[in-house]
Regions:
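A penicillin-recognizing enzyme superfamily signal
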Residues: 1-139, 145-146
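Secreted/processed peptides and extracellular or luminal domains of membrane proteins
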Residues: 136-138, 154-157
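Short, low-complexity, Pro/Ser/Thr/Gly-rich segments in the mature regions of secreted, periplasmic
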Residues: 156-169
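Amphipathic repeat-derived elements
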Residues: 108-112, 152, 169
Length: 169
C-alpha cells in the first residue's frame, strides 16, 4: 500500500522553478495554449503542449494552483492521431477545467529574480531604455551590469549562452 509522503524535497532552486513556471504561463496567455487563456480569461494557469512526429500523439500538461494534469491522446496501433497538443489533449484538459473550475496560480516573484531588459538582436542584457529591448524576469546573479544601447556585443551567441546557462544554475 502506497502512502504519499507530505514532505517535498527541492531538486531545483526556487528561481529556476519560478522562471520555468512563468514561461509556462506565457504558453497560456500568448503561445500554443492561448485557446485555454481565452476560455478562462483572468485565470492564471501554466501549460505545455506537445505533438510527436507525424501527429502520432497529442500531449498536454496543464496546472493551476490545485493540480497538475497530464493528458495524452493517441492510438494504440501507433498510427497518427492527426491532432496537435493544442487541437487534441488541450481540449480534454479545457473540458476538465470547465467541470472542476480553475484556481489561479499565485506567482510571487522570488528573491534573486527581477525584471531585466535584453536585446532582441543579440540576447545581451541591456539598459531598460534601449529601443526594441525585451523585458522579461531573469535570475540576475552572474549576468553582470546591463550594456548601454550603443555598446556592441562582441559575441551575441555567447551572451545568449551565458543567459541560458545561468537559468538553471
Amino acid at each position: 500500500l502506497y502512502q504519499h509522503d507530505e514532505a517535498a524535497k527541492r531538486v531545483t532552486d526556487e528561481q529556476a522553478s519560478w522562471l520555468t513556471l512563468f514561461a509556462m504561463t506565457k504558453t497560456v496567455s500568448q503561445g500554443t495554449a492561448r485557446a485555454l487563456g481565452a476560455k478562462f480569461p483572468g485565470a492564471t494557469m501554466a501549460a505545455k503542449t506537445g505533438t510527436t512526429n507525424e501527429l502520432r500523439d497529442s500531449w498536454f500538461a496543464g496546472m493551476d494552483n490545485n493540480e497538475l494534469v497530464s493528458v495524452w491522446v493517441g492510438r494504440d496501433d501507433n498510427q497518427p492521431a492527426g491532432l496537435t497538443g493544442a487541437s487534441g489533449a488541450l481540449q480534454l484538459f479545457s473540458g476538465y477545467m470547465s467541470q472542476r473550475g480553475v484556481n489561479s496560480l499565485g506567482l510571487k516573484m522570488p528573491e534573486g529574480v527581477s525584471w531585466a531588459s535584453f536585446s532582441r538582436a543579440s540576447g545581451a542584457r541591456v539598459a531598460s531604455d534601449c529601443p526594441g529591448s525585451l523585458q522579461v524576469p531573469a535570475k540576475l546573479a552572474g549576468l553582470g551590469e546591463p550594456m548601454s544601447c550603443a555598446s556592441p556585443v562582441s559575441n551575441p551567441v555567447n551572451a545568449l549562452d551565458q543567459w541560458f546557462g545561468g537559468f538553471f544554475n
